[in-house]
């Protein structure tokens, strides 16, 4: 038998895979993963067919279809008041998970520490470990799963390379407030700490709450990656299409890894989202 050391000795099949298999086996309603029990908009589905029939079946640009990046730039600017250059600050990814892994792979090296709020989406920890980093957990507190920012401050040191935030939060559903983002901004001021903001549930928010994107805060924007997904918003999780926003100097490093990770993302689907978003609120 060939001997080797596992890079993830404690990792097993994800709970999402286990629960989804059980749901299929027993024809049960699946509440374990973030996808709906109804189909995507038929117009969006038809637009994929149109794109394929129009010949968009070969490799797209590594950074993604420009028309889609331009639409994303416009939408983000309208929502949060920050302009991201579609040429140099937006990259289309093969889902948010690929974007998250690419950010971590581009910047985390052996000995780096990454603060992660727990409980957390189960991708963060193994992605950090695979790149030699160390997860520093901060546990959300109380019935409202709030953040103890004093604890965060205590855990920041010279080895802290990144803080991962996720709002609206998976799995608790808690929403970061303006006060939270301002506290974060204050803590990382005058440091080289990067922020990875997972915002895949940004448009799935209720009770008149407001999504406080990192993109609303200029001092955070300059050190942050914002990762999002069309799958959650438009009920197309199997299409694995998302995007990443970051200032040019950070996005340059992201794209270096992205090109060797997936090279590019699904071509006709990008054109479909581009056209669909142009006529969507």
Kindly give the residue locations of the regions a language model identified.
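A short helix-loop-beta submotif of the ANL/AMP-binding
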Residues: 130-135
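Active-site phosphate-binding strand-loop segment of PLP-dependent enzymes
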Residues: 136, 142-208, 212
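Short acidic capping loops at alpha-helix termini that bridge into adjacent secondary structure
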Residues: 84-90, 110-113, 159, 221-224
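N-terminal small-domain helix-loop-helix segment of the aminotransferase-like
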Residues: 5-95, 102, 276-279
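PLP-dependent aminotransferase class I/II
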Residues: 223-281
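Short strand-turn motif at the edge of the Rossmann-like AdoMet-binding core
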Residues: 34, 119, 168, 199-201, ...
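Conserved PLP-anchoring active-site segment centered on the Schiff-base-forming lysine
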Residues: 106-128
């Amino acid at each position: 038998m060939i001997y080797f050391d596992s890079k993830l000795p404690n990792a097993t099949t994800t709970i999402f895979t286990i629960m989804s298999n059980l749901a299929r086996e027993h024809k049960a309603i699946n509440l374990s993963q973030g996808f709906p029990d109804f189909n995507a908009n038929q117009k969006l589905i038809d637009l994929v067919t149109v794109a394929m029939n129009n010949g968009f079946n070969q490799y797209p640009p590594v950074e993604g279809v420009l028309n889609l990046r331009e639409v994303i730039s416009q939408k983000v600017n309208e929502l949060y008041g920050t302009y991201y250059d579609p040429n140099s600050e937006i990259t289309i990814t093969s889902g948010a998970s690929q974007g998250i892994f690419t950010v971590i792979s581009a910047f985390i090296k052996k000995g780096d520490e990454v603060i992660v709020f727990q409980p957390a989406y189960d991708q963060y920890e193994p992605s950090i470990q695979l790149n030699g980093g160390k997860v520093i957990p901060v546990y959300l507190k109380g019935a409202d799963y709030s953040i103890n920012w004093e604890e965060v401050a205590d855990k920041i040191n010279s080895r802290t390379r990144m803080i991962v935030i996720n709002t609206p939060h998976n799995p608790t559903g808690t929403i970061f407030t303006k006060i939270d983002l301002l506290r974060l901004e204050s803590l990382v001021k005058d440091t080289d700490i990067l922020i990875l903001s997972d915002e895949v549930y940004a448009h799935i928010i209720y009770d008149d709450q407001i999504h406080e994107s990192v993109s609303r805060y200029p001092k955070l924007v300059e050190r942050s990656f914002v990762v999002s997904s069309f799958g959650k918003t438009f009920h197309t999780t199997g299409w694995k299409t998302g995007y990443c926003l970051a200032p040019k100097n950070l996005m340059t490093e992201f794209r270096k890894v992205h090109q060797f990770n997936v090279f590019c993302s699904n071509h006709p689907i990008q054109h479909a989202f581009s056209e669909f978003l142009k006529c969507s609120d």
